Curated annotation (Swiss-Prot):
Record-given protein name: Ribosome-recycling factor
GO annotation, biological process: translational termination
Xref: CDD domains: RRF
Subcellular location: Cytoplasm
Length: 185
């Protein structure tokens, strides 16, 4: 019973950290990354479809993305979706390929992005702590139901705390790496 609670807590904490990594992958850090376009969707045959499901996205140069739609008729729609997005990119097209030149980030924009990065990290820390609280509540319930002894529950709560500390440290490490990447000129 206790092992199930610990395993579930760890699985949920791993998912929280993975979600943060996915979030960070979509944040523009001054260099081209195909994941930047993950949140951009295009109205395609009546359905909102992610750009990466409509085209090949490649990085020919460190600060350029090329988008080559499989269906040429979707090219103008993809261009419009990129212009409407909050990425601040201007697509240029030659009729078959869209090129996105990633401009250098201004110091002001870098600071804004770092604030976003810190906020997302804090949200992840809160999620991990909420998982800890849920696990501790579940452990107390086991003790109350006389399924586990007080000592076992105390040990398990210590394990949950160590797990929480480990994942918060991992979140801080990921945040620090992303922050460095953004502040790099």
């Amino acid at each position: 019973m206790i092992n199930d609670v610990l395993k579930e807590a760890e699985d949920r904490m791993v998912k929280a950290v993975e979600a943060l990594k996915r979030e960070y992958a979509t944040i523009r850090a001054g260099r081209a990354n195909p994941n930047m376009l993950d949140k951009i969707t295009v109205e395609y045959y009546g359905t909102q479809t992610p750009v990466n499901q409509l085209a090949n996205i490649s990085v020919p140069e460190p600060r350029m993305l090329t988008i080559q739609p499989w269906d040429k008729s979707s090219l103008p729609m993809i261009e419009k979706a990129i212009l409407k997005s909050d990425l601040g990119l201007n697509p240029s097209s030659d009729g078959t390929v869209i090129r996105l030149l990633i401009p250098q980030l201004t110091a002001e924009r870098r600071t804004e992005i770092v604030k976003t990065v810190k906020k997302k990290a804090e949200d992840s820390r809160v999620a991990v702590r909420n998982i800890r609280r849920d696990s501790n509540d579940e452990l107390k319930k086991l003790e109350k139901d006389h399924t586990a002894s007080e000592d076992e529950v105390k040990r398990a709560q210590d394990d949950v705390q160590k797990m929480t500390d480990k994942f918060v440290k991992e979140i801080d490490r990921i945040m620090g790496t992303k922050e460095k990447e953004i502040m790099e000129v």
